[in-house]
């Protein structure tokens, strides 16, 4: 989830102990950052697998082929990770020894083309030689095939070599046609309610007995921290039930952005076509479009005071301090028409691409048994605690992450709660997206 915060899809923001993220800009990067350069320890382990398997006198040929394929898969994935972050990397493909120190003088790949050539070579071996079935948590030929198609598609994007498109399509089609797996409508693919769905071709699994919410940032750093007193002071129209104690007691600093939310299209109720929420007929018929450049004062859109007298405003003074003509803070300014029978949240979020509902926590949805309010003054909103712009372990964007979260942490979302957690490394749906 930290890498998602390096994209327009997410942010990392804390206005308390962790501070504001300054690594999301080029000015925040330095030679002191490790963005995947130092993978030599991992590569040594992988290369030892490949070398020792090939030199084994106890393994039969079938065992050698399969075990070596595991090594090729892991090396291909490491190289792919490095290529995506840096383009070029040091392609370590042998096991170094103290007796031959000169062997470590390996130059970086000449260019991106050489980088992807090495990646594809390793992943093709894995896609050919891994077994078609394996225990949950172990890779198969089908998982390797999807990874191969992913890497080949990326290779085409950065090299322009059209032959990689053939590799991507062939690998994806092989998985779709021959794996015997079908797409699932289950949203439990991304949480604990459907851990072993067949569409998950390869997952990383952690058992409940030794896994806690605090063990992973994807959990501890996505659940907010909001008390009953916060909600009362904020005058939220919807109270938190707090059925098992404080429901949300995480340290959220990662949040999805409006940029990401806008990518999930809405079905137009008149035409049946998928389009951005702000272009649908049902939305346009219920709002008046105003000029966003006319927003010049704090609280101009909406404002009120909490019980303790603290102001809560849209926009906030900080919003107005961050104006940049190249990247406007305010891009849309709409007012709900008088007499409209639906509010803005319903108009924005109803009829979305179904993936939206498994990925994002949004205003008026249900989350861990609570009805979520994310509008001004809401129970999990940006200003519900003492930071008007959010960031005290609560949202700064108006949304929370739901994908790959735990839907029903027992008894509640706090650091010591034990959970059964998994991450999808590869799933069948990606093969279809590659073909598309």
Regions found by a protein language model. Give the residues of each.
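An aromatic- and glycine-enriched ligand-binding surface/loop that stacks and positions planar moieties
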Residues: 1-10, 150-382
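Conserved, well-structured interaction surfaces
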Residues: 7-86, 106-117, 121-138, 308, ...
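Structural recognition of the beta-strand scaffold that forms the well-ordered cores
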Residues: 50, 90-91, 200-204, 430-433
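Short coil/turn linking the two alpha-helices of tandem helical-hairpin repeats
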Residues: 83-85, 90, 134, 154-160
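Short, solvent-exposed loop/turn segments at the edges of secondary structure
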Residues: 86, 139, 146, 178, ...
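Amphipathic alpha-helical protein-interaction segments enriched in hydrophobic
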Residues: 137-147, 424-431
């Amino acid at each position: 989830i930290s890498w998602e915060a390096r994209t327009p899809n997410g942010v990392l923001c804390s206005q308390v102990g962790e501070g504001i993220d300054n690594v999301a800009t080029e000015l925040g990067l330095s030679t002191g950052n490790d963005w995947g350069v130092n993978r030599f320890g991992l590569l040594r382990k992988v290369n030892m697998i490949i070398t020792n398997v090939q030199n084994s006198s106890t393994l039969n040929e079938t065992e050698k082929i399969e075990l070596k394929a595991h090594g090729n898969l892991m090396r291909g994935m490491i190289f792919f990770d490095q290529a995506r972050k840096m383009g070029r990397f040091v392609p370590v493909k042998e096991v170094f020894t103290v007796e031959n120190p000169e062997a470590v003088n390996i130059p970086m790949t000449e260019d991106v083309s050489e980088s992807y050539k090495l990646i594809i070579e390793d992943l093709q071996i894995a896609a050919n030689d891994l077994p078609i079935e394996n225990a949950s948590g172990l890779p198969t030929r089908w998982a390797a095939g999807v990874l191969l198609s992913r890497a080949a598609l990326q290779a085409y994007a950065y090299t322009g070599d059209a032959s990689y498109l053939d590799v991507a399509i062939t690998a994806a089609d092989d998985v779709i046609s021959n794996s015997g797996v079908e797409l699932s409508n289950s949203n439990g693919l991304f949480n604990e309610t459907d851990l072993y769905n067949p569409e998950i071709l390869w997952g990383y699994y952690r058992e409940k007995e030794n896994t806690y919410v605090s063990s992973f940032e994807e959990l501890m750093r996505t659940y907010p921290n909001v008390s009953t007193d916060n909600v009362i002071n904020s005058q939220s129209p919807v109270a938190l039930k707090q059925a098992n104690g404080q429901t949300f007691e995480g340290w959220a600093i990662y949040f999805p952005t409006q940029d990401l939310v806008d990518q999930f299209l809405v079905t137009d109720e008149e035409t049946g076509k998928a389009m951005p929420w702000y272009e649908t007929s049902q939305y346009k018929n219920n709002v008046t479009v105003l000029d966003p450049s006319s927003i010049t004062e704090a609280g101009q859109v909406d404002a009120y005071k909490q019980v303790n007298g603290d102001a809560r405003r849209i926009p906030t003074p900080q919003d107005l301090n961050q104006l940049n003509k190249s990247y406007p803070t305010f891009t849309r300014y709409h007012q709900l028409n008088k007499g409209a029978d639906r509010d803005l949240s319903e108009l924005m979020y109803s009829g979305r691409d179904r993936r939206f509902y498994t990925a994002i926590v949004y205003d008026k949805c249900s989350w861990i048994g609570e009805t979520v309010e994310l509008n001004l003054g809401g129970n999990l909103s940006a200003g519900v605690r003492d930071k008007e712009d959010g960031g005290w372990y609560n949202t700064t964007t108006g949304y929370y992450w739901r994908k790959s979260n735990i839907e029903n942490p027992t008894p509640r979302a706090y650091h010591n709660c034990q959970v059964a957690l998994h991450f999808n490394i590869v799933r069948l749906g990606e093969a279809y997206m590659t073909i598309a």
